[in-house]
């Protein structure tokens, strides 16, 4: 009897998964019934269950799951257990899309805003200069020494609470959804994998790698909370993070947001016209350059041969979920920032 029930469950999830792959999803259905009604209720349940827990339930669940897999491998027999394995895989994939993954099928912001396929170097330069000027003004407001990098004395819990508060009070927040950032239990692992954070799609916990420079912890936490809101596209999560932080009443949060935006913009400008990018950088106070170097030095510290494997795997994951630019999707936020600036 148990054998038949297992096969019935497997058949149901297989048909769901097959239908999901074959049938094109209606963007309007994802954005309206799912995005406006179904997902907010799922998010509310997860927020109620896990937001008060001071550590990451999702990380703990992954660790236990991986441990159980290694234990079971010793007794694994292909013919006997293949049905259970397939059932588990189909259940996990199905739950992933039902709990959160459907958001990948929303109409992209760049499509709804009718962004051009390319942006001019002139517009890119103007936008980069705009953020450079704003960043310089904020640096002068926070520090009297132009040669000193901006630092915050806040510890991890206070940083994450500040990021959570920033997003909670943002005018961009969906009315029915609340977010909260948590420190991952495995920051060293994420660092070696090259990840600043991630959203657990099952528990909806916004996990942050708190080993990063503190200013980047702030913007990463806001990025992951944007994912909690149902923003799946990486460029859009970056955009929401930047818009929320640059509108904050707290100067150091505004600085962190402008710094993130500037780093994406200056990297794009450097690829388009290295001379113009260098001209912009030459006018920046040394303290801002120190903040930029701090982020670069952190990631260089954790570079390793396996990082490429993780990046390629994540690149394929993103491409399989409607983000054709793959891991380069993060930098596509530049298009949204330039569009904002030229249409201000």
Where are these regions (language model features)?
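N-terminal membrane topogenic signal
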Residues: 1-11
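Membrane-embedded alpha-helical segments of integral membrane proteins
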Residues: 15-73
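Active-site recognition of the HExxH zinc-binding catalytic motif
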Residues: 54, 217-238, 242-243
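Transmembrane alpha-helices and immediately adjacent membrane-cytoplasm interface residues
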Residues: 62, 67-74, 78-112
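Membrane-interface segments at or immediately adjacent to transmembrane helices
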Residues: 102-171
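Post-HExxH zinc-binding segment in Zn-dependent metallohydrolases
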Residues: 122, 131, 232-276
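Auxiliary, metal-adjacent structural segments of Zn-dependent hydrolase domains
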Residues: 143-210, 214
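Pan-zinc metallopeptidase signature
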Residues: 288-344
């Amino acid at each position: 009897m148990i054998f038949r029930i297992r096969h019935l469950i497997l058949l149901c999830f297989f048909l769901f998964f097959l239908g999901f792959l074959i049938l094109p999803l209606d963007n309007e259905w994802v954005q309206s019934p799912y995005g406006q009604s179904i997902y907010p209720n799922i998010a509310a349940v997860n927020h109620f269950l896990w937001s008060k827990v001071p550590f990451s339930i999702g990380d703990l669940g992954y660790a236990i799951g991986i441990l159980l897999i290694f234990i079971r491998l010793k007794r694994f027999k292909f013919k006997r257990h293949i049905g259970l394995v397939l059932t588990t895989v189909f259940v996990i994939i199905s739950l992933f899309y039902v709990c959160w993954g459907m958001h990948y099928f929303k109409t992209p912001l760049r499509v709804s805003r009718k962004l051009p396929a390319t942006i001019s170097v002139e517009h890119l330069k103007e936008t980069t200069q705009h953020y450079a000027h704003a960043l310089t003004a904020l640096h002068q407001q926070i520090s009297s020494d132009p040669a000193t990098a901006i630092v915050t004395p806040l510890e991890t819990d206070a940083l994450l609470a500040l990021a959570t508060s920033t997003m909670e009070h943002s005018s961009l927040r969906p009315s029915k959804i609340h977010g909260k950032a948590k420190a991952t239990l495995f920051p060293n692992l994420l660092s070696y994998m090259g990840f600043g954070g991630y959203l657990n799609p099952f528990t909806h916990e916004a996990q942050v790698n708190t080993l990063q420079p503190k200013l980047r912890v702030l913007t990463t936490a806001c990025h992951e909370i944007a994912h909690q809101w149902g923003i799946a596209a990486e460029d859009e999560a970056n955009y929401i993070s930047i818009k929320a932080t640059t509108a904050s009443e707290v100067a150091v949060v505004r600085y962190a947001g402008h710094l993130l935006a500037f780093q994406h913009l200056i990297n794009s400008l450097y690829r388009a016209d290295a001379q113009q990018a260098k001209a912009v950088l030459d006018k920046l106070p040394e303290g801002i350059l120190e903040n930029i170097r701090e982020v670069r030095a952190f990631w260089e510290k954790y570079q390793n041969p396996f990082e490429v494997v993780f990046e390629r795997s994540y690149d394929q994951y993103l491409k399989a979920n409607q983000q054709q630019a793959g891991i380069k999707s993060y930098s596509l936020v530049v298009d949204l920032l330039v569009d904002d600036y030229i249409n201000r």
